[in-house]
């Protein structure tokens, strides 16, 4: 298997090459040249399923005995044996908890694996990588946790100043490691993401620092997330049984992993895109139109995004892998801030996708009512997913098909939202009990590409190698 660019103007790569480069040479995203077929007959054991699924993408590039060891090691730090518990909330509505990793967010599932893969590949090659990433809250801490203390890696994470929760920020900025560098950017997450993309698009700079990516622009992230869709289906009967998934999403990586699972043969008749008031994705899946607007701060800040990087992977599929058409659409979108796909394109996804969006008041009510009815406390992003699942079920669409809603973060990561709903803050796990007393280490920078590039150079140890 090879990996190809969504614009079609960059060389094909092996899995290992795509892992280390992150973005293609033409500045965009990798996808598999063909979708493999799932042949899974497991019982929902996470580690076994993870190896079976991901070996479809890695077998030609990685020694599989070694890869199995990397998988087993990646999930040792999770708090529960099943890795992703599945809980029935209502009749035929389930919650899959993805937040039992070291930083309490679903990003740990992919990034604990990616950190191990980076380490293996770089040690094998005797190379060094400078990781640069942007975060709307959870990716940063998960990436830092996965990469801290690794001799062949430096990691620089950009987050939007004052636009992540305090717990999210402190999980990043209290890490004191020689290879970890946090930067607060005076702007939005979209600004942070644009800075990262601009650095990758400067090929001379990229090669000089040997830049690597941990955001979901890196295919390995998406690959690792396919696994829990398969696991959910297995635990509900088999991977042939139809299951609808409700996915709170901002950057489209998590829900695209569900689409990838479907492309590999998993029976997912519909994916529900769950958004907050920053509902550009909901607009697209309901009307086939995208229109950039101002980012509105909400109680679910990880979804306060207007430009969703991973949507390009989906558009590439819609346009039957015509890179030129993809390029033209996104260039128009960047220039005009508005784009609509034709009716024949919309027809390709209108029956298999649906979009829902909710405001903060609805989210607060959901957290409150769920805690009262079941004792389960949802974080605001997971509440958006549950709201979408119930809204879909209320329409009596596919009533016999189970809906799995993905719980993406521990409620303690968003204490203000939970306190507003319940009148008290959820406690942090014991290992993070002193988080608010730990010293912070970060640099404040303007939204200025040259300033940020110079700072990344100062952080990288590449010249010491």
Residues covered by each model-derived region:
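PLP-dependent amino-acid enzyme catalytic core
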Residues: 1-465
